[in-house]
Amino acid sequence: MSSEEKQKKKRDPNNPCLFCTDPKGVSLTNELAYSARDTYAVSPGHSVVIPKRHVASFFDLTPDEVIACMELIKEEKRLIDAEFKPDGYNIGVNVGPAAGQSIYHVHIHIIPRYQGDVENPQGGVRHVIPKKAYYRR
């Protein structure tokens, strides 16, 4: 997004989206998306990948936007690996209020994980519904 486009969006009272009007800490960018460290990080290196086009749902991204986001996820992982050396990752998207979406502009979380950051990591993203998190193999 050019600085001219950013300024136009800042002046547009009909588009109050913080990802459109005031992206902070941008680390990587491509034609269709950018990445930045999460302002409310849950672990060291927690980042988000955000499409430049304002769209609320991951399921409404174009195929090209999905590819652009996935490319940045991989690039951002390399940056996080070099700086923080995590032991694993969770990648996730909240879509809709029932899933906890609070900003209605798609953003894909890249959450580095570290040995011992939780007592029992089994189930990973399944912990979004705590009673269903643990399972037997």
What are these language model-derived features?
Residues 1-137:
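HIT superfamily nucleotide-processing domains
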